[in-house]
Amino acid sequence: ICSQYAAELYGMKVLEESIETNKHNFTRFLVVADPWIADDLRKQSKVNKANIVFSLPHSEGSLSQVLSIFSFYKINLTKIQSLPIIGREWQYLFYVDVIFNDYLRFRQSIDAVSPLTKELKVLGEYEEGKSNI
């Protein structure tokens, strides 16, 4: 279930078209691939956006330190959402969407931020979609 463009871009087949209920809907799609071919798929598009999730120690300035590093590396946050970790008092997961112009700088920012986090995962990297509105 994706656009014809996405299917052509990643060498896939459209199973069903126009399944949305809102014609102005913007949906993120996920390509699940064998790790050995994932890099080949990624190279077909310009990677300039990513989704990240991380947790931090519950201490003063921990989030500010992470955000300062992203700023230093010229990483633009387009979304940040904190959700409590169920069963762990005062612990939160931070879901962050970022856009960037330089993939190497993005990877360097992840390397710089990682030691400050309790856990960090890059959920996905892809080309930012363009709005038709």
Which residues make up each language-model segment?
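Domain-level signature for soluble enzymes in the chorismate/prephenate branch of the shikimate pathway
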Residues: 1-133
